[in-house]
Curated annotation (Swiss-Prot):
Organism: Enterococcus gallinarum (strain EG2)
Name of the featured protein: D-galactonate dehydratase family member EGBG_01401
GO molecular function: magnesium ion binding
InterPro entries referenced in this protein's UniProt entry, alphabetically: DgoD-like (IPR034593), Enolase-like_C_sf (IPR036849), Enolase-like_N (IPR029017), Enolase_C-like (IPR029065), Mandel_Rmase/mucon_lact_enz_CS (IPR018110), Mandelate_racemase_C (IPR013342), Mandelate_racemase_N_dom (IPR013341)
GO biological process: one example: amino acid catabolic process
PANTHER family listed in its UniProt record: D-GALACTONATE DEHYDRATASE-RELATED, STARVATION-SENSING PROTEIN RSPA
Length: 399
């Protein structure tokens, strides 16, 4: 096979709608270019700098066909590795190289990887409201659209300190009463189960805001409601507690969106401490490591449910779709509603139909990036507070 020489690497940090997105474009001497997702919305300019200043000079003139070797070179080039900024930068290039290879082969990515493992991947969406009546309205809307898996949440991950008993002059920010959260959420599960029966299966995201003993109590109490999975019940640095949790509860556990380093998941998967791996593909370095992780999980009976939040580019969404169509142990795909500006910048974005994502048939990843449209939406950064929830006494909760 004749070499496909990398002639340029470009990065784009944009904010077409609510979130900052980072996209990488790799150009070649054959006139074929590829796209990749490097989105890390909390540090977009840091990721862009790594792509532009460090990875671009490293890759110029290399053969784009050599994906595995290029990934290994990018991973070890800085010596210190497996951090979210570098991993996301690597991901953008890695995805773009797979996109190029698919176009050269005139095959969609899922076919390049080995073909379909299923006709379509089930999708789940998010029903979020401040009260049960509004939540029922959201659920009804999604049921009518064909969804049979719905993540149900009452409120956001925190509240106003004026609503809680706090010390005088509390620190400003988002507050979270763990006991109240557990009681309210269990009542929500019961109410939804009573109203809808088995019309759909619930999912729920704790977002790591419980202490280990609370997590065990909560997982046990959730058993009667037969959740599809309970997500991120503990932060990664408390994952060893999952051994005790698994011994006391049959509620399916999903985790992984904060993982960067293989050492964070190897023991969890090997010891079957989770049911679903929720890794964020760009956060672990792209398609190349995602395939290795998925195959490792498959051997251990752990299913895949890639993290697909609203702060992911349509390129990342498309990659998840291709992976989920191909991988034997893919279980479900999170879905997001793409706003109008985002759709104008990224043409060909996958959309669920009747509660499923179907195969994308264009060669490569299948997304077109409109650089002129993107130029109208420069990146805008501001500090985010939602990661900084506090208990009523003011203690910061580790997500």
């Amino acid at each position: 096979m004749t070499p496909t020489i990398i002639t340029d690497v470009k990065s784009f940090a944009i904010k077409p709608d609510r979130h900052n997105l980072v996209v990488v474009k790799v150009e070649t001497n054959k006139g074929i270019s590829g796209l990749g997702c490097s989105t890390f919305q909390f540090r977009p300019l840091a990721v862009k700098t790594v792509v532009d200043e460090y990875l671009r000079p490293l890759l110029m003139g290399r053969d784009a066909n050599e994906i595995e070797d290029i990934w290994q070179v990018m991973n070890v080039n800085s010596y210190w590795r497996n951090g979210p900024i570098t991993n996301n930068a690597i991901s953008g290039i890695d995805m773009a190289l797979w996109d190029i290879k698919g176009q050269l082969a005139d095959m969609p990515l899922y076919q390049l990887l080995g073909g379909k493992a299923r006709t379509a991947i089930p999708a789940y969406t998010h029903a979020v409201a401040d009260n049960l009546d509004d939540l029922y309205h959201e659920i009804d809307r999604f049921l009518a659209a064909g969804y049979r898996y719905i993540r149900c949440q009452l409120g956001f991950y925190g509240g106003n300190p004026s609503q809680l008993q706090t010390p005088e002059e509390p620190i400003s920010g988002s507050y979270f009463d763990q006991t109240d959260y557990m009681e309210t959420t269990l009542k929500m599960f019961a109410a939804i189960k009573e109203k809808y029966g088995n019309q759909f299966q619930m999912l729920h995201d704790v977002h790591e805001r419980l202490h280990p003993n609370q997590a065990i109590q909560f997982a046990k109490a959730a058993e009667p409601y037969q959740l599809f999975f309970l997500e991120d019940i503990l932060p990664p640095d408390q994952s060893h507690w999952l051994t005790q949790l698994r011994s006391q509860s049959a509620t399916p556990i999903a985790t992984g969106e904060l993982f960067n380093n293989p050492m964070e998941w190897q023991e969890l998967v090997k010891n079957r401490q989770i049911d679903f791996m929720r890794a964020h593909v760009s956060q672990i370095g792209g398609i190349t490591p995602a395939l290795k992780l998925a195959h490792f999980c498959d051997a251990m009976g752990v299913r895949i449910a890639w993290h697909t939040p609203s702060d992911i580019s349509p390129v990342g969404l498309a990659v998840n779709t291709h992976l989920n169509i191909h991988l034997h142990n893919a279980a479900i795909q999170e879905t997001i509603e793409l706003p109008a500006n985002t759709q104008s910048v990224f043409v060909g974005s996958p959309q669920p139909k009747g509660g499923f994502f179907y195969p994308m048939e264009k060669s490569g990843i299948g997304i077109t990036f409109d650089e002129e449209a993107a130029a109208d939406f420069p990146v805008v950064y501001r500090p985010h507070e939602w990661t900084q929830s506090r208990t009523p006494d003011g203690t910061l909760i580790t997500p």
